[in-house]
């Protein structure tokens, strides 16, 4: 077998969302506004949950971790994308690209698995309310959060190592606004069959298992709600689960659209638009979904603002 002449790539060029100069500044302003709102919303939600004793429950423990993941998730991608709107040569070093891919995969996987943990929490709350504090003890809650973090970071590390051990000799221009797997694989001259098989198996197991947990949990939840005799009880139960159902639908729906569409319809331009949605828009939407639809969070936020105003006026 002939030896591939592999020149070590030291940096990549991120093509970005657009090459039209007149669009770059408006897009910079839009995405900067979204990122600031995302940061304020997610860190604000964590602060509200941490400072209000009424929110020290399993449901809000999971929600604060989801907000943390959303903040990290967005921060891995958006600042570099904002910088690329301002510079003509959108360079990223080899090591920085590897770190970005690894962190992105870790937080995306963690979010996917955390949504499954939250679905299980809602299942226990609706279907086994008398045993809720036993089945969702602090130790179990910690395990339901620690397991997604541990699994996601180990998988992301192995995934990034496999990707960046490949030989890149075709080009160093990544047709994306961040370092993602599929655009990177198009630049390599190494055999990628084993790598693609790893992606398919690992992502498939993670995605199907987490989606199955969510589906089974909500099948039992909806069945239990429909059996409730009290209309007020049904309304309260649907209200409790509605925010999570909406967040799950948006997140998994975007991933299904991106990764399960026919290969004939698959293009990097379509990937870019879908990637904007789940790397930039979803982390901004989640605090809105969980706070605007949640009376306890809104009351805690009002209480926090009132106490801060009282401190400033005294």
Curated annotation (Swiss-Prot):
Cytoplasmic compartment residues: 47-54, 121-133, 218-237, 293-314
Subcellular location: Cell membrane
Keyword set includes Membrane: yes
Disulfide bridge map: 97-189
Membrane topology: Multi-pass membrane protein
Entry keyword set: Cell membrane, Disulfide bond, G-protein coupled receptor, Glycoprotein, Membrane, Olfaction, Receptor, Sensory transduction, Transducer, Transmembrane, Transmembrane helix
Signal peptide: none
Biological process per Gene Ontology, one example term: G protein-coupled receptor signaling pathway
Residues in compartment: Extracellular: 1-25, 76-99, 155-196, 259-271
Main location class: membrane
SUPFAM superfamilies the record matches: Family A G protein-coupled receptor-like (SSF81321)
GO cellular component terms given for this protein: membrane; plasma membrane
Transmembrane domains' residue ranges: 26-46, 55-75, 100-120, 134-154, 197-217, 238-258, 272-292
Residues glycosylated per entry: 5, 265
Record keyword Disulfide bond present: yes
GO molecular function terms listed in the Swiss-Prot or TrEMBL record: G protein-coupled receptor activity; olfactory receptor activity
Functional note: Potential odorant receptor.
Family note: Belongs to the G-protein coupled receptor 1 family.
Protein name (Swiss-Prot/TrEMBL): Olfactory receptor 8U9
């Amino acid at each position: 077998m002939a030896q591939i002449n592999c020149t070590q790539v030291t940096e990549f060029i991120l093509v970005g969302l657009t090459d039209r100069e007149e669009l770059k500044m408006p897009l910079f302003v839009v995405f900067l506004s979204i990122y600031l709102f995302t940061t304020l919303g997610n860190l604000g939600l964590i602060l509200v949950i941490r400072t209000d004793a009424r929110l020290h429950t399993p449901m809000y423990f999971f929600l604060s971790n989801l907000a943390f993941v959303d903040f990290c998730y967005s921060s891995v991608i958006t600042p570099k994308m904002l910088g690329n709107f301002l510079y003509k040569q959108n360079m990223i070093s080899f090591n920085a690209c590897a770190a970005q891919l690894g962190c992105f995969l870790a937080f995306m996987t963690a979010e996917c698995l955390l949504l499954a943990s939250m679905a299980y929490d809602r299942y226990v709350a609706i279907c086994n309310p008398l045993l809720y504090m036993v089945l969702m003890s602090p130790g179990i809650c910690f395990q339901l959060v620690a397991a997604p973090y541990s699994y996601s970071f180990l998988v992301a590390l192995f995934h990034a190592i496999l990707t960046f051990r490949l030989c890149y000799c075709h080009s160093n221009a990544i047709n994306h606004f961040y370092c993602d797997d599929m655009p990177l694989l198009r630049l390599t001259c190494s055999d990628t069959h084993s790598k693609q098989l790893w992606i398919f198996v690992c992502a498939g197991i993670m995605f199907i298992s987490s989606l199955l947990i969510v589906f089974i949990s909500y099948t039992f939840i909806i069945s239990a709600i429909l059996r409730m005799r009290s209309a007020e009880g049904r309304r309260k139960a649907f209200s409790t689960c509605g925010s999570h159902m909406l967040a799950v639908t948006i997140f998994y729906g975007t991933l299904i659209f991106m990764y399960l569409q026919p290969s004939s319809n698959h293009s990097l331009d379509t990937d870019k638009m879908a990637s904007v949605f789940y790397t930039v828009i979803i982390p901004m939407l989640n605090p809105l979904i969980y706070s605007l639809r949640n009376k306890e969070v809104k009351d805690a936020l009002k209480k926090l603002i009132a106490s801060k105003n009282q401190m400033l006026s005294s």
